[in-house]
Structures are given as structure tokens and as C-alpha cells.
Amino acid sequence: MEKIIEESKQGGSLILENKPENTKKLFIESYGCAMNFSDSEIVASILSGNGYNTTNVLEEADLVLVNTCSIRDKAEQTIRKRLEKYNAVKRINPKMKVGVLGCMAERLKDKFLEEEKIVDLVVGPDAYKDLPNLLNEVEEGRDAINVILSKDETYGDISPVRLMSNGITALVAITRGCDNMCTFCVVPFTRGRERSREPQSIMAEIQDLWHKGFKEITLLGQNVDSYLWYGGGLKKDFTNASEIQKATAVDFDQLLEMVAVGFPKMRIRFSTSNPQDMHESILHVMAKHSNICKHIHLPVQSGSNRILKEMNRLHTREEYMILIDKIRAIIPNASISQDMIAGFPTETEEDHQDTISLMQYVKYNFGYMYSYSERPGTLAGRKMKDDVSDEIKARRLQEIVDLQQKHAWWRSEDFIGQTVEVLVEKVSKKSTEEFSGRNSQSITVVFPKEHYKIGDFVNVKIKSCTSGTLKGEAVGYSEMN
């Protein structure tokens, strides 16, 4: 599984509209990837129906929940510091309960509850519907835990509230879990095996968002392009499905087509893709429909075949390059972004140079780059020595970052003189006189407000750029308005 960590969103307290009949207060923070933020919306919806309104004031909360990430050691250390803060407040307000959700819950359940005694409940990603029962256990003075992984839970029957929402963009989860056993990743062990959500429940959720005025959705999954609905159950069991189930199964390109046709004025994104599942049929659907954004996040992790094999990635360097060529041929204006790990165990300078040369070949629009962080419970953590020094990791990572910066500038400059369609999402951070949004390629665009408003689709002529931002002037509304 690939996880995009948006640093600007980490740790925000999440708020939804209060119900007057609710008397208890929930403080919930989320860390990690978009799936964690989507899960927090599900949790808030469940607890809203069980007497809880949300608050962004920690000290007044009856219940504090933190949705956790285990992808890197830095993320876990951040969450541990937050737990220390919660417990400091709890010493002043002993009635306050503290719970851990998400990926750290399964991995560190015993440590949190029994050894360190810093939380009252621990709830895994597939057990959120059990929260009301677990809270009853806590109220009766018992620690509560449920980290059982499910074969079929997709939360398709839960209508998520939209936390920290701008009312314009929303996440729609379509798969859960992961069947790819990448040696560096904890996700298959913390989120379970892959299963997909029923298509009609997805369409119903998008319909609800459309009626509420949302303009853009992101179809979300650990491996979104391997979506496969055949009546329920794990994807790995599809081979045992009946002939009728196989004949009526819906895969990702079919779902993408359904959404694009069903909501022609809704902008559609998806994340995250795995190279081995990004089939030509998906690319043709993307090219066919103008409301499907022309951006593909396509993690590669390394440009070295030897390291890819050590990582148990299900593609080679050559297969990845062929896929890049297909994307360029079928969707010439597509942007492509990457995940890259520097300093994986046994990585040599030659392996690193293979990564550099792959980046030179693709010239990504942007990327998410990290030095290797050994994660307990992964195959790499158990079987491989973390033998690349921190100094070498840092140097290689910086070389990757510097090259990506160069390519991002080059790609951004290509937009100068073009007119691009932008969905206005918010006021610019740098100037209250400017709006900020993204174009189809997921590049941030900033332009003067004039008479436009948040939620408008605006055509913007690009005048200048930085490596990560396009700057221009509005020339009118787009056809999507």
C-alpha cells in the first residue's frame, strides 16, 4: 500500500455540526494518510448518533480519540507526544477518556493498555462500529479493546460526516485493506486483507455529496485501482466466486466510468494506485471523460530492480517505464507523482543511481520522498538489517529531493501561457486577495479573487510559476460551472 501523507493536515482537530440533543463532547485528531481522515469521518458519524458532539477544545472533552499512523517512526513519535498531552489534561479532568484508533492500535495495543496504561480504549480500523459498546465498557471501569480485522467490513452503510470540510471536496472510500506484502509496510497487518465496497453504496454517497453542493470527490483506497466488487468478501477469494458473480463483477475502470457518467459536473480524482493494477482500460476511461482529473499518483519506491525485489514490489523498473510510456501516449497532459524511499536495506550507490536515472526518465510533476524507517512487524524489520547509515540516507534523500524540485520547476513552466480549469477551494495562504485551487493535474493554482467565489470552476491563464504553484489571472467561468 502507498500512503500519501499531507503534512499540512496532520493533527487537526475535527469538527462537525452539533446536534442539540447530544450532551457529551468528542475531541478527535487524525494523523497519516487520507484513509485515516476518511475513517475519522466515519467515527464521528457513529459517535454523533451516540450522544457526542465534537469540540476543538481538548480541555472540555469527555472523550479524546487520536487516529494513528504507523508508516514511519516520526509519525509514531508525534502521536506519543500527543498522548502525553492528553494524559496531562486527564490528570486535571479524570473523567476524560482517551482512546487510540487506527494503525498503531493493532500493533501497540498491549503496550498502550497494560504496560504504559496511557489509554482507556484501543480500536482497530475494522472495529469502529463497536465503539459504543467499547465506551460502555470504559464507563464501567474496564479497559476496552477491539482490533479484530474483518473480511467484509467496508462501512458502506455509514454516511460519513465531513470533518474540517470546505464543502467543496470530499473523500469517498471504495476499498479497504491491502493484499500487497511490501516488505517495508505495516498496512496489511494493521488494516487487513483487501475488500471492496458495493458500487451502489458508492454512487449513493456521491449523490448525497452532489446534493449538498460538493464539486469534487476523491475515490480512496489503499490500492484503489485494484477495486473489485463481486458480491462481497475478500478480493483474494474472487477465484472461488460463482460464474454469475464473476460475470457481474465490477472492477475499477467500470466503477470510474459509472461515476464519471453519473455525475458529469462532479470532478473526480482517485488515490492511491499501484503500478501493477494500473491497466490500459483505466487510462482510456480517464482520457474519455473530461471530469476525471488527469493526475496519477504512481508510487515506485526505487528505480533499482534488485531493491524492488527486496521490497517485494510486484513490478520491475522496465514494466514501470512501459506503463509511463502508455500514460504519456493515452493521456498526454497527465501529471504523474511518485513515492520514493532512500536508503532501503542493502541499497548500494548503484541502486541509488538507478533511482536517479528513473526519475530523469519520468520527470515527475511532484512526489513524496522519505528515508527508510524500519517498522516493527514488517518483513524488512524482521529479516533485514537496517545497514545504510543515517548520513548516507540523508545524502541520497537530498539528491532525490533536489532532482524532484528541478523536474517540478520544469513541469510547472510548461503551463505558462496555458489556460487551465481550476476549482476554487480556499483563500490563498499568502494573500487574502487571492484564491487557491487545483487544476486537473493536481497542481496548485493561485489567482486574484475578483468576483469569483469558493466552489466556482474558473479558467485561469497561467502567467508565472514556482516549483509547486502556478500563478495566473482568471479569464472566465469554465464549462463545469
Curated annotation (Swiss-Prot):
Q: What residue stretches are annotated with the Radical SAM core domain?
A: 164-411
Entry EC number(s): 2.8.4.3
UniProt keyword annotations, A-Z: 4Fe-4S, Cytoplasm, Iron, Iron-sulfur, Metal-binding, S-adenosyl-L-methionine, Transferase, tRNA processing
The residues covered by the TRAM domain are: 413-476
| Binding-site residues, [4Fe-4S] cluster 1 | 33, 69, 103
Q: How is the cofactor bound?
A: Binds 2 [4Fe-4S] clusters. One cluster is coordinated with 3 cysteines and an exchangeable S-adenosyl-L-methionine.
GO terms (molecular function) for this protein are:
4 iron, 4 sulfur cluster binding; metal ion binding; N6-isopentenyladenosine methylthiotransferase activity
UniProt lists the family membership as follows: Belongs to the methylthiotransferase family. MiaB subfamily.
Stored NCBIfam families? miaB-methiolase, MiaB/RimO family radical SAM methylthiotransferase
UniProt name for this protein? tRNA-2-methylthio-N(6)-dimethylallyladenosine synthase
Give the source species: Flavobacterium psychrophilum (strain ATCC 49511 / DSM 21280 / CIP 103535 / JIP02/86)
Q: Which gene specifies this protein's sequence?
A: miaB
